[in-house]
Design a protein with these regions (language model features):
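ASCE RecA-like P-loop NTPase motor cores
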Residues: 26-507
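Generic detector of low-complexity/intrinsically disordered segments
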Residues: 9, 25-26
Length: 509
């Protein structure tokens, strides 16, 4: 029931608040850093948006033309209201650009990046028309995985000066806030704790011991010294014991092991976003077995022994892997059992880690909103064949992105940012539209000319030569990546300095 889920969510957030009350006593404020001051339509737009948030408006639209400085306006609003903020973008490239810009505006605050950590992802699928089963295949980017962990760690810390720039990954399932917060390790100088107890807690937080090579998410032990390669940061945490007392806590450079900083108190966050215990695993296996028997009986009653045998073999193999190794391929399809959720209940996601008064900014909302609403349907359609043909249990349906109405229910106040807001945003804002038309640069929109496609390359060469003669530059857009490459080669053959760019290289992380 929605009310029960809401109460449960509040309890989770309350537990996080209680656990990290120490840091909340020292809440940081946003410090906006910029050599520019708001100009053009920006000052009025900032004032209107801030007034709307303080007035309690649930939705506002920032309608700004291209180049009017909408990102700078949003940064000023964030600094003014001083709330944890989620900025949602519809693709990784734009998210990375926003992340870089926000890091520049808030160098002293927690600006984080949360997108899919797959460099390559082929989802599991079954096509009944050709009887083709496609196994899941993927490649994980370790740097992005680290940034995702850091984003969640910043939220768990209880600090208020957090901006997270995310793609639609923020509506996909992850571990529960309760499980993650319970596995945070609080260390204090002078604390009495047995070394082996610390090692046990590290393993419980999914750090693994490796005394030979210290890699991200591992730890090593040398006498009274425990070195931990923190999973969410590029540092090594060194804990030195004197008998059963923590003598010192230091952050060290992972390459040189030179000390970077000393601490009297330190919070170490888990090495993975999906936490579980042996007790939860045992309960999950029992629940999986029960549902497996129901599904076998279901297929047998339909007279389909092939599907019954298929689901039996696949699930029993998965359970054996979970018992032996603690995981299996496609373990996410059993997430409901490990989380203790009921059938149909939404998964935990990044939004669960935010306080209730967080600010949501949806960039390019005319594209992002339809994308959010489409995620559930696409996921459901793919998994329907897997379940109906005996490749997965029905619980696979519950490893999913949020439905759009679930996403809406989890948000408090939203700013939709777009040059062309759609009907949905305008309806939600009930006419509260903040316009930003005058650019800080004073530049006007260029005059648009539509020319015939005949002899377009010759016409293009003529225009390029005109610009070169004026010591100016030219930007050409093409329909496809291949066209960009071929046109670039053609222009180079005509001795015109040219470079194509059709995807941004990974931002420096």
């Amino acid at each position: 029931h929605p009310r029960v889920r809401r109460q449960r969510q509040m309890c989770i957030r309350d537990s996080i608040t209680t656990k990290f009350v120490i840091l909340q006593l020292n809440m940081s404020k946003f410090e906006l850093t910029s050599e520019y001051k708001p100009t053009g339509d920006q000052p009025e737009a900032i004032e209107q948006l801030v007034d709307g948030l303080r007035r309690g408006d649930k939705a506002q639209v920032l309608l700004g033309v291209t180049g009017s400085g909408k990102t700078f306006t949003v940064a000023n609003v964030i600094a003014e209201v001083n709330r944890p903020t989620l900025i949602l973008s519809h693709n990784k490239t734009l998210a990375s650009q926003l992340y870089e810009e926000m890091r520049g505006f808030f160098p002293n605050n927690a600006v984080e990046y949360y997108v899919s950590y797959y460099d390559y992802y082929q989802p599991e699928a079954y096509m009944p028309t050709t009887d083709t089963y496609i196994e899941k295949d993927l490649a994980i980017n370790e740097d992005i995985d680290r940034l995702r962990l850091r984003a969640v760690s910043s939220l768990l810390s209880g600090r208020r000066d957090v901006v997270i720039v995310s793609s639609v990954s923020c509506i996909y399932g992850m571990g529960s806030p309760m499980a993650l917060s319970e596995n945070v390790i609080l260390l204090k100088k002078g604390q009495i704790i047995e070394r082996n107890e610390l090692l046990r807690r590290l393993v419980q937080s999914l750090y693994t011991r490796n005394d030979l090579e210290l890699q991200r998410g591992t730890f090593r032990v040398k006498g009274d010294t425990v070195d931990i390669a923190v999973a969410y940061n590029e540092i090594v945490l060194r804990i030195v014991f004197w008998d059963d007392e923590i003598e010192s806590i230091e952050e060290c450079d992972p390459m040189t092991m030179q000390r970077i900083a000393k601490f009297d108190e330190y919070q170490l966050y888990p090495a993975n976003l999906f936490m579980t215990t042996q007790e939860q695993t045992n309960m999950a296996i029992k629940a999986i077995q029960d549902d497996l028997m129901k599904q076998i009986i279901f297929f047998e009653e339909l007279g389909d022994s092939i599907k019954a045998q298929r689901i039996k073999e696949r699930v029993e193999y998965d359970m054996e892997m979970i018992k032996e190794l603690g995981h299996c391929s496609g373990i996410e399809n059993y997430s409901r059992y490990f989380d203790g959720r009921n059938a149909g209940e939404r998964p935990y996601c990044l939004l669960d880690f935010f306080p209730e008064d967080f600010l949501l900014v949806i960039d390019e909302s005319h594209v992002s909103v339809p994308q959010i609403s489409a995620m559930y349907g696409g996921d459901r359609a793919r998994k329907t064949n897997l379940v109906e043909y005996g490749f997965r249990l029905p619980a696979a349906f519950d490893n999913r992105p949020l439905r759009f109405e679930e996403f809406e229910a989890m948000t408090d106040q939203v700013i939709y940012v777009s040059a062309t807001p759609a009907d949905y945003e305008l309806e939600q804002s009930e006419g509260v539209v903040v316009e930003q038309v005058i650019r800080p640069t004073g530049l006007l929109d260029p005059e648009i000319e539509v020319r015939p496609s005949e002899n377009q390359i010759d016409d293009l060469l003529y225009e390029i030569q005109q610009r070169i003669g004026s010591d100016e530059r030219v930007l050409i857009t093409t329909l496809t990546k291949r066209m960009a490459e071929e046109l670039s080669e053609y222009l180079l053959n005509h001795e015109i300095p040219t470079a194509y760019i059709h995807s941004l290289s990974l931002i420096h992380i």
